[in-house]
Amino acid sequence: MIQTAQHTLLDYQRDGFAVVEQVYAPAEIRALLAVIEQAGAQGGSFRRTADVFAIRNLLAELPALRPLIWNERFKELLHELLPAPQHLVKAIYFDKPAGSNWVVAWHQDLMVAVDRRAELPGFGPWNVRPEGVNVQPPRQYLDGICTLRIHLDACDAGNGALRVVPGSHRHGVIPAADIADFTPHAQVCPVPAGAVMLMKPLTLHASHRSLDERPRRVIHLEFSSQRLPAGLRWREDAAPAS
């Protein structure tokens, strides 16, 4: 067993993000990309333009990815971060192609994917997209989510690495009018290929356009050990595993 350095986990708790290197070997990255590149682009979960290729409900759409993602190092990391059972909250693939002008403004990840709509105290707003139902849950659920971003390419300021505000997750849901007060403390988070960036959903983050010809391909996974109330289920977790 290869344990994650204690200071990395402490950085994650304090700053709201951290990077764990060498989770996937080059051959494992090639295997993941092969499955993704063989996929079609049909249905509401797929979005393909000149600036972005994205797949939502990723593991429901491409179940062959599941055993490739859950290698021994990933399983160890997940167990270090969250007690069992770890529910899959969200799974998305992002490709920021070479020369992309796609910009992501400062935000927190406030919406979660669920299997249906249910009128519950503290849950809302709701929205329904082609891929399913999404809702903003109470803060306690957002605080319990851990995001693991698997980087299939090396990523830095030149090809759209995330900019993050250390410690911003500790301020809860930040009103849009107050975000500018936090961004002067932002920093770029470079991530090597095969590494996993850990992030808390309430960490303020943004992404600039790519400045060079390198792609930035990422598998974005969110997990929680919490159960939702009243029989509501995390949508990805409710999808059948293969």
Give the ranges of each region predicted by the language model.
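Non-heme Fe(II)-dependent double-stranded beta-helix
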Residues: 1-15, 20-129
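Short, solvent-exposed loop/turn segments at secondary-structure junctions
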Residues: 25-26, 94-96, 111, 155-157, ...
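Non-heme Fe(II)/2-oxoglutarate
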Residues: 42, 162, 169-187, 192-198, ...
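Active-site rim elements
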Residues: 62-67, 135, 184-185, 207
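A structural signal for short, well-ordered beta-strand segments
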Residues: 90-92, 148-150, 219-223
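Catalytic core of non-heme Fe(II) oxygenases with the double-stranded beta-helix
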Residues: 100-190, 228-235
